[in-house]
Amino acid sequence: MSADASTTPAADSNVTSTPETSTTPAAPAPEVTAVESTTAPNASQPHSASLYVGELDPSVTEAMLYELFSSIGQVASIRVCRDAVTRRSLGYAYVNYNNTADGERALEDLNYTLIKGKPCRIMWSQRDPALRKTGQGNVFIKNLDSAIDNKALHDTFAAFGNILSCKVAQDEFGNSKGYGFVHYETAEAANNAIKHVNGMLLNDKKVFVGHHISKKDRQSKFEEMKANFTNVYIKNIDQDVTEEEFRELFEKFGEITSATLSRDQEGKSRGFGFVNFSTHESAQAAVDEMNEKEIRTQKLYVGRAQKKHEREEELRKQYEAARLEKASKYQGVNLYVKNLTDDVDDEKLRELFGPYGTITSAKVMRDTNIERTQTPESDKEKENKEATKENEKESSEAEKAEKTEEKPADSGDEKKEDKESKKADKKGLGKSKGFGFVCFSSPDEASKAVTEMNQRMVNGKPLYVALAQRKDVRRSQLEASIQARNTIRQQQAAAAAGMPQPYMQPAVFYGPGQQGFIPGQRGGIAFPPQPGMVMAGIPGGRPGQYPGPFPGQQGGRGMGPNQQLPPNFQGIPMGAMQGPVPNGMGYPQGMAQVQFGRGAGGRGQVPGMPNMGQGMRGPGYGQGRGGVPVQQGQMRPGQGGRGQNAAQAPAGRPEEAVAGGLTAQALSAAPPPQQKQMLGEALYPKIQAQQPELAGKITGMLLEMENTELLSLLEDEEALRAKVDEALNVYDEYMKNKGGESEATGEAAKPKEAAKETSTEENKS
């Protein structure tokens, strides 16, 4: 006969509902409190052969239990109860014997046996929950010494009758909570134990023993106690008040059963105490009259004495209410700002966001631990050096004042003092963490600030501005994004395994003289192709995915007479293909050869197609023939890559035409996604002339500016040079902070590898 996990005796759940013991010194006789009963069958009912084994280590298995319990007799079955989802052990099991006699012997001999270093607790299994929760014969013991464990408690109470279950409540670390339960087979045995043990000393501690009271009954009785309290708590008591004076303050309200002041180990008053009255009316009168009454320059607090768990519950409710109120108050008005430079402080942050509304608070988060890296001797040396420098400056200034008439030095000294004081203030603060918070007075102001300040360049770094979110909200959003990403990966894996996948817009390469469009690294703005363009190969190239061989293809996949190309597909114009198509130059396989080669021995351009891919220029590319930007490792003239035509026609310099002919009218006429592309193509050759290695990086940084500013930079060479220098300084500082190797000339660490990674990602997209 096997038992389910649902037959867990209530003793396991008892710990969660156990009340806190009263720590009030002046409290009356303690209440009889206990937890859910763990009743077993009565003496008149025959025992089954099923045993409950509790207090097990999570690593205990059925095999370990079988090895132990089979020594008593023949075991029918053993089951360790586990969580339905995680399959982790719940810490208890059921052992079924073939006969009841073996079960009785196991209960007597194996109870509290060490299994994996923990004493197990064995009792008869009771499948009927009604019998488990009657509470008959269940005894609650509190104020136990921490040294008393399950076995010691069992040995103490075994003299009064047959014990079905015995347990000392423990915390998560295995330490005693100071109370426990003993479940007798009969109610007479329980009454006998209460009569003899209640009030006795166990390990020099007076214990309370009483009948088990269910949680429901305890709750109703607790509400009744709150309404008819007699114990009063007083705080803010002057330390000079004696026990006699304290008692005299409250004697006028009625008969006092006990009054005490709490004191520390040295005997000094801790400023609070308890007074227990004989009647509720006296206690209520004391609270009404003495609360907030001034005694010896201190206002007393007088109220009903509360138990620890009751105070904790009230504090938790207050904290939760305050948290919800705060969350609703700042909903939609608190902004999170990151990517701040180290020199931005609270005042500067307020200045940045001040134009967009009324700021109630602005805070830059800083490290709280300020480590001093200098010894006191080095500090003194530094002070001496600064003093000598100041003396030298003063002497030089005095000499200059004698020779020429200058402005009074007072104003300069005041400015220096102000600067020094500001520096001293900043030294007292920790290092900026690079992010902060700005709180506005209304949601409209906050949304306006997000719109205007997000991605705004401040001190060479683009700000990230968004509405502040709670940690749990951010975590849930992150989990959702990770789950979506995993779903995409699974779909990609399924597609790679041969499952059909939807048609996607391929990358677009334009012929000579046409405005170029670069798809983004993770996807671009797709628009209908135009005459003269070439399409990159459709991913996959499997049969049925729009194969499109050219005439003369050999070995390529053919296209049936009824097959059609996708509606947005246009092949290479035959006029652009001069000469025969090479073997295997079908679509999509042959189209891969249209792209530039990846190395000195890679594929070159298709014969007869001069300057193919001129539109593919932009940040991250080097300079190739005819002014066309070339990726790192791309073929250059004379490298002799396979498929390159030696008699290729010379290419013009379309960049100069774009830069010279780009006007505000032409820019505004273009679609918004294409405007930055046009500006980037016009800026790139100018920036490359100044910084060949970092032209792509700097172009991308400058494209964060407004379009009107970029147009003015195209016309003003000096302004462009200044912006390039500024971007270069920002990039150098970024590389230093990142730990990369950056030289004073502005060369980035390993630019070739960065360019190679960029090129591979773009071609993947």
Curated annotation (Swiss-Prot):
It is found in: Cytoplasm; Nucleus. GO terms for cellular component: cytoplasmic stress granule; nucleus. Residues 49-127, 137-214, 230-307, 333-470 form the RRM domain. InterPro entries: Nucleotide-bd_a/b_plait_sf, PABP-dom, PABP_1234, PABP_HYD_C, PABP_RRM1, RBD_domain_sf, RRM2_I_PABPs, RRM_dom. Keywords: Cytoplasm, mRNA processing, mRNA transport, Nucleus, Repeat, RNA-binding, Translation regulation, Transport. Its main location: cytoplasm. SMART domains: PolyA, RRM. GO terms for molecular function: RNA binding. Residues 659-736 form the PABC domain. Pfam families: MLLE, RRM_1. The keyword Amino-acid biosynthesis does not apply. One of its GO terms (biological process) is mRNA processing. Residues 1-49, 364-427, 619-657, 737-765 are annotated as: Disordered. Residues 377-427, 749-765 have a biased composition (Basic and acidic residues). The keyword Repeat applies. Residues 1-37, 628-637 have a biased composition (Low complexity). Residues 38-48 have a biased composition (Polar residues). It comes from the Eukaryota. Belongs to the polyadenylate-binding protein type-1 family. Binds the poly(A) tail of mRNA. Appears to be an important mediator of the multiple roles of the poly(A) tail in mRNA biogenesis, stability and translation. In the nucleus, involved in both mRNA cleavage and polyadenylation. Is also required for efficient mRNA export to the cytoplasm. Acts in concert with a poly(A)-specific nuclease (PAN) to affect poly(A) tail shortening, which may occur concomitantly with either nucleocytoplasmic mRNA transport or translational initiation. This is Polyadenylate-binding protein, cytoplasmic and nuclear. It comes from Aspergillus oryzae (strain ATCC 42149 / RIB 40).
